Amino acid sequence: MSKKYDAGVKEYRDTYWTPDYVPLDTDLLACFKVTGQEGVPREEVAAAVAAESSTGTWSTVWSELLTDLEFYKGRCYRIEDVPGDKESFYAFIAYPLDLFEEGSITNVLTSLVGNVFGFKALRHLRLEDIRFPMAFIKTCGGPPNGIVVERDRLNKYGRPLLGCTIKPKLGLSGKNYGRVVYECLRGGLDLTKDDENINSQPFQRWRERFEFVAEAVKLAQQETGEVKGHYLNCTATTPEEMYERAEFAKELDMPIIMHDYITGGFTANTGLANWCRKNGMLLHIHRAMHAVIDRHPKHGIHFRVLAKCLRLSGGDQLHTGTVVGKLEGDRQTTLGFIDNLRESFVPEDRNRGNFFDQDWGSMPGVFAVASGGIHVWHMPALLAIFGDDSCLQFGGGTHGHPWGSAAGAAANRVALEACVKARNAGREIEKESRDILMEAAKHSPELAIALETWKEIKFEFDTVDKLDVQ
């Protein structure tokens, strides 16, 4: 051998702690929140994360001499304190692009959040953010259609899309399920959806559901003269079954299908997104299982990372929480990952949880979906927070109306249009929310009843995962 080989164990920081390194534009950058075991220096723990998520192992190995370790290794180039947390710190790591397969989110996550999360030198580890370089983004398919194309397909402009999840989400026969879809769509909603856990159960097989839903959508379109749709969940036991369901939705001339991207997996999701792009189908994405991964403030993966990965893997709509509803998520954090779903460039902004500038180039945007514990009183705040390029989904806030789902849908439609009209007239819709809604209710008995029904319903719990800012 031309180089000397010294067997044994050496400290990670000797190789992977490089504070003088200046990241390249082509590097994939990651920010981890690290909590090491007591007595282990920060630099050693951070370097261990860089090593174990790239080229390193616990021992010096002779085969390192067969490659260019200096070229391929991950480098921890910066360490920062976490505001208000004396135990943890931020480790910023740069990875050369050649470590990752082109267009493969699966491969990126296998490296960054693989075995390193079980490393004994760590008490906790959380992936807070990723900066994907443009050279990698250009290898990803991204959203199969994007916001502009979706609006054209649905012929909906100048306001958020309005939808709901069918309830009860489990237990209905296919025919009764279709009846509920019809009631919601004829009442004024643009879209209805399968819940994340409705696939093909004994009480309702998928083909039966698809057929009755297609009939309901077409009847509602004929009655209202509007384009309607329903998110048909194609998540299945195998990829082959998933594609079979997608093909049948296409045969029924349905405009949009759905996938549970975390439980279904990024490989399946990317494949389905590619199919949708080729077949002119919109793709709605549910984030079931996300909170298992992202809710602990010191361990796991932040949802902003999962949202970025979804935009690259492919989806036209993604659930993001509501801020005001029953699900976890504060306003600034939510706005931070909504920006990364929709904008072409997102600057670093710690007040929104964004640790890096992120350039998305010409990649299409993704509709942010607000769903979970929302009702008509939330409409002004939802419009102010999410803006027009969003989908507002009221499940219980539609079906729980005393007069039924059609009346609940009508109430939500009137409330939305009243808020959009008030905003366009220059009114401060959050401050004037009560006046705006009460004025609209004078001409809508459905809205008046909805306002009375849900006037005391609030979800005022403190956020578990807060931004690390002072």
Swiss-Prot record:
Please name the InterPro entries in this protein's record.
RuBisCO, RuBisCO_lsu_C, RuBisCO_lsu_C_sf, RuBisCO_lsu_fd_N, RuBisCO_lsu_N_sf, RuBisCO_lsuI
- Amino acids binding substrate: N115, T165, K169, R287, H319, S371
- Which EC number(s) does the record attach to this protein? 4.1.1.39
Q: What is its main location?
A: other
Keyword DNA-binding in record: no
Q: Where in the cell is it found?
A: Carboxysome
Catalytic activity, per the record?
A: 2 (2R)-3-phosphoglycerate + 2 H(+) = D-ribulose 1,5-bisphosphate + CO2 + H2O; D-ribulose 1,5-bisphosphate + O2 = 2-phosphoglycolate + (2R)-3-phosphoglycerate + 2 H(+)
Keywords of the record, alphabetical order, are:
Bacterial microcompartment, Calvin cycle, Carbon dioxide fixation, Carboxysome, Lyase, Magnesium, Metal-binding, Monooxygenase, Oxidoreductase, Photorespiration, Photosynthesis
Q: Where is this site: Transition state stabilizer?
A: K326
Q: Does the keyword Magnesium apply?
A: yes
Q: How is the cofactor bound?
A: Binds 1 Mg(2+) ion per subunit.
Q: Where does Mg(2+) bind?
A: K193, D195, E196
The catalytic site is made up of K167 (proton acceptor), H286 (proton acceptor)
Q: Which residues carry this modification: N6-carboxylysine?
A: K193
What are its GO biological-process terms? Answer: photorespiration; reductive pentose-phosphate cycle
Q: What is the purpose of this protein?
A: RuBisCO catalyzes two reactions: the carboxylation of D-ribulose 1,5-bisphosphate, the primary event in carbon dioxide fixation, as well as the oxidative fragmentation of the pentose substrate in the photorespiration process. Both reactions occur simultaneously and in competition at the same active site.
Q: Which HAMAP family match?
A: RuBisCO_L_type1
Family stated for the protein in its record: Belongs to the RuBisCO large chain family. Type I subfamily.
The record describes its quaternary structure and partners as: Heterohexadecamer of 8 large chains and 8 small chains.
What else does the entry mention about this protein? The basic functional RuBisCO is composed of a large chain homodimer in a 'head-to-tail' conformation. In form I RuBisCO this homodimer is arranged in a barrel-like tetramer with the small subunits forming a tetrameric 'cap' on each end of the 'barrel'.
| Protein name per Swiss-Prot or TrEMBL | Ribulose bisphosphate carboxylase large chain
Q: Which organism is it from?
A: Prochlorococcus marinus (strain MIT 9303)
